[in-house]
A protein has these predicted regions:
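Glycine/serine-rich phosphate-binding loop and adjoining beta1-alpha1 elements at the start
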Residues: 1-52, 207, 289, 293-311
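Feature captures the FAD/FMN-dependent oxidoreductase FAD-binding
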Residues: 1-35, 126-139, 144-147, 169-171, ...
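FAD-site-proximal beta/loop scaffold in flavoenzymes
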Residues: 39-63, 148-219
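Rossmann-like NAD(P)H-binding beta-loop-alpha module
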Residues: 57-87
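A conserved FAD-binding loop/helix module that cradles the flavin
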Residues: 212-246
């Protein structure tokens, strides 16, 4: 615990000490914009910003203009959080179209309803700073839709002049990365921010070493990380020469669906945008008692009939 690969310990030494090694470091670092001025005061990563808010170390954004670079779910979390921290104006800056954003449509709609400005087809070019080295704005290059590449519309500059978007805080949310340097030095294949495993989660050139989760798949959901862990655990078990079968100490009945009538899902309502931006309470309203009872009857009892963790 508390050891750093490449500094305190190496993959080779771990491999000599253990029969198998699993790399599951997640994707905890942020991708950089790679533009002038990125080291200025007031330029922060979305992950560190949201982590601080979660630790009750929220920055005071009262009266500020805040810009967030990116179009994913993390950027939506960042803009909506900034609004709740008192920012006067919050803008999303994205180099593609709204339709190309990877954020859930409901998140985008929620942000717009809360007064977030969405600036699309704007590619960051450089960061402007004041005399104290603090961010004062970001210059962007207008973009236009271009050729289709890999099934997705690419963008290219329109030829118009760059213009400045004023901001006193700039949050970068263009994706997450892994600390790959020391793994690459150890012979672990790394490409474009991911550890490149074989289909079984291991490496042909480094027997006994495996990787799984966000560091191998790229940033994903918690449930996908859990699923990846189950797969790689089974593969490590087989690599070690075992074929353990996970079982439970209860008798699992045969699935039965004959007593389940099809029923639509309850659609939750949301609090008014003007009200919810003032606090960090839930956006969705609770179900009524009748709705909760109806929704509970839709449960297929996967836990009881041998699915989920018992599968």
């Amino acid at each position: 615990f508390g050891k750093r690969i490449g500094k305190d310990i190496t993959i080779q030494s771990l491999r000599q000490e253990y029969d198998a090694v699993l790399i599951s470091i997640g994707a905890s670092t942020d991708k950089k914009l790679g533009i002038e001025g990125e080291q200025a005061e007031g330029v922060i990563s979305a992950v560190s910003f949201l982590r601080d808010v979660g630790k009750d170390k929220s920055p005071d954004l009262t009266g500020q203009e805040v810009a967030v670079i990116g179009g994913g779910n993390v950027s939506m979390d960042a803009v909506r959080t900034a609004k709740r921290l008192g920012a006067k104006k919050v803008s999303i800056v994205y180099r593609r179209r709204t339709a190309d954003m990877t954020a859930l449509p409901a998140e985008i709609e929620g942000a717009v309803a809360e007064g977030i400005e969405v600036l699309t087809l704007k590619a960051p070019s450089r960061i402007e700073t004041d005399e104290n080295g603090h961010v004062s704005g970001i210059y962007v290059t207008p973009q236009m839709i271009s050729k289709i590449k890999d099934g997705r519309a690419s963008v290219c500059p329109t030829g118009e002049e760059d213009f400045l978007i004023p901001c006193q805080t700039l949050i970068v949310a263009i994706g997450q990365d892994i600390e790959s340097e020391h793994f690459a030095e150890a012979g672990v294949p790394v490409s474009r921010g991911k550890i490149m495993t074989e289909r079984y989660g291991g490496f042909d050139n480094i027997p006994g070493v495996f990787a799984g989760g966000d560091c191998a798949s790229g940033p994903a959901s918690v449930i996908k990380a859990i699923a990846a862990a189950k797969v790689v655990a089974a593969n490590i078990d087989e690599y070690l020469g075992f074929h353990h079968i996970i079982s439970c100490d209860v008798e699992i009945p045969e699935p039965r669906l004959s007593d389940r009538e099809p029923c639509g899902r309850v659609e939750l309502t949301e609090r008014e945008a003007c009200s919810r931006v003032c606090d960090f309470e839930g956006v969705e309203n609770c179900m009524t008692e009748a709705e909760a009872k109806q929704e509970s009857h839709r449960c297929l009892r996967c836990d009881h009939f041998g699915y989920g963790i018992f599968k």
